[in-house]
Amino acid sequence: MRYFTSDTHFGHPLVTALRGFLNNGRLRAEYLDIWQTQTRAAAHAWIKQYVHDNQTSFKAICDIARHENTIIDNINEIVGHDDELWILGDLSYRCTVEHTLECLRRINCQHLHLIIGNHDRNFRLRFNDMLYEDVFETIDDYCEIDMELPVLDESGKITVATTQQSIAMSHFPQTLGIGRRTRRLAEQLERVRRYGAYHRRLAALRPYASGRSRRH
């Protein structure tokens, strides 16, 4: 089986806190209440204001270990040892290479693949690919693979028929006009896209991408 995930953000205090993994029970409860009764954006704004007003840091209030344990446990609950797992970027941030490798080795899957994200050490320096070569079978900023996928009917519902389709994978939706390759991709919207991060400045492109993926 082939699985996809993204934005694990191992070791990243800001993302850990914004996802609600806070080391103070009262603070966590209040944060989650704002998230549920208002919006995620309101909760994010509230916790950022809390850090500012109390002159503290996201590192001081977040629970990185619980965040990482939850991600790894969730992956291991679904992905098998002989399966294939694609991580579509933002593997880790603000932590050592050794810590990142330790997290990866706790994932019970022997076929790991990395699509590089903007927070990854090898985003600008591809020389750093060598840091992760022992755990990943492939490392790239963009990759296409062929997969057998269900055929959709005219209403968009899944049918019993399947067809071989090309899957384009990147950390961002590859519809930006940055260079020849992405312009070519923008002209081929029928291709199935898998991407990890969806940033606000890409709002106009949203209808043309498939979003975070699950399993196939």
What are these regions (language model features)?
Residues H113, M130-K157, A161-H216:
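Conserved beta-sheet core of the metallophosphoesterase superfamily
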Residues M1-Y3:
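Extreme N-terminal starter segment of soluble prokaryotic enzymes
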Residues T5, F10, L14-M147:
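Core catalytic region of metal-dependent phosphoesterases/phosphodiesterases
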